[in-house]
UniProtKB/Swiss-Prot annotation:
The keyword Zinc does not apply. GO terms for molecular function: transmembrane transporter activity. Belongs to the major facilitator superfamily. Monocarboxylate porter (TC 2.A.1.13) family. Residues 1-66 are annotated as: Disordered. It is found in: Cell membrane. GO terms for cellular component: plasma membrane. This is Fujikurins efflux protein FFUJ_12242. InterPro entries: MFS (IPR011701), MFS_dom (IPR020846), MFS_trans_sf (IPR036259), Proton-linked_MCT (IPR050327). Induction: The fujikurins gene cluster is specifically expressed during rice infection. SUPFAM superfamilies: MFS general substrate transporter.
Amino acid sequence: MATNVGGAVDNSRRSISDNRHDPEKPAELPDTLSGSETERPQDANPEAALDQQASDAAKAHDEGPPDGGTAAWMVVLGAWCCSFCSPGWINSMGSFQEYYQREPLKDYSSSEIAWIPSLEIFFLFGLGPIVGIIFDRYGPRPLIIGGTIFHVFGLMMASLAKTYYQFLLSQGVCSAIGVACLYSPALACISTWFLKRRGAAMGIMATGSSVGGVIFPIMITRMIERNGYPWALRTAAFLILGLQVIACLTVRPRQKPVPKKLPAGRLAAPFTEPAFALLLAGIFILTYGMYIPIDYLPLSGLQEAHMSVNMSQYLVAIMNAASLFGRLGAGYGADIIGRWNMFIIACGVTGISNLAVWIPATKSSITIGYAIMFGFASGAFVSLVGALPVSVSPIPELGYRMGIVFLVISIPALTMAPIGGAILQHASNGWVSLKVFAGVMCLVGSAIILGSRMLYTEKRLIKAF
């Protein structure tokens, strides 16, 4: 992505200070923190110097994100398709877990089979820094094209799989790598087209994963019953391919990326900034509280609320449907009260609902009510978690810093299932202990992110940020 070229050290520091606390304007960092433009060895590479001068001239006439227009909303459309096909697909993995245990992998334990969806979630977020660096240098198109190929090819191979390692490699690795290349670039592109309406645009994009989380499980379950597992996967792969063609044609950054290597010092910079480090710590803790209900609510409904098997399976679809409205509402609310404020409030409400509603949910009606409340409140986590680093990151490092946040999310996403299982198995009152753990993680994570927000706003609590 295009960058601003700094002057002397004092000017660079002043630019960073001016932009750091503005919630409506990402900070801009110079390419170097020492030396002036005249000290660059431009003569060594005349073509690179001309490219840099052209980039500087384009930026000098840049009037900022348009916050609308045909091109901007077409980017949102393509990003919605990416969201539908990446986290929306991941949200359907429960359908495969049940089928694998019943048919092709019935000789394997549930914990062994669980590695397939766990790896998908891990790759979705864990490849974030690598995907981010590629995005910053070359833009979204190579990633989206490559991700589409990996995702579709992995699903086609999974439709032919017969053994455990074939399912693991095709769906848990190949398809998952493709998924990782789709979501982050689309999310980062939206931030270059929108500023004042960025929350709403990201909220609209995030509804794609909710719609996918509702459509894919129902489609896969019904097609396995009627047409068999292989054609269920192939049909899903063809649907994903069609939507990703739209994404390839519409998702593009507002400014042409300038390939350049990020200095090693800048790679480590996010971890040395107290406010950003607090943000990472808060998101790490918060993720545990967000993912435990998603994974364990159907089992809780079956064992505690004595729901039927069919009804307990529909709890995930109910959560995703409620999450759709939560993501839209959080996006529009973020443009009014600030992205950080909206995120912290919604995640705090999620923690309270885990403690106040999920713990006493021993009846079907209460469990369904909790699924709706949790889905609506947790929608802000999905729609706004990428907006937090965007609002405080230098534009040249946008993809990389967003990737770091996703990498932090990947660790709890990978370890959450065994931790939750251990709590259920070894705690004296397993379900209550698990629900308390989820609620406390949400509240503690929200409090830490509030601390990060206070550092960014110089301890001003009443401020749209």
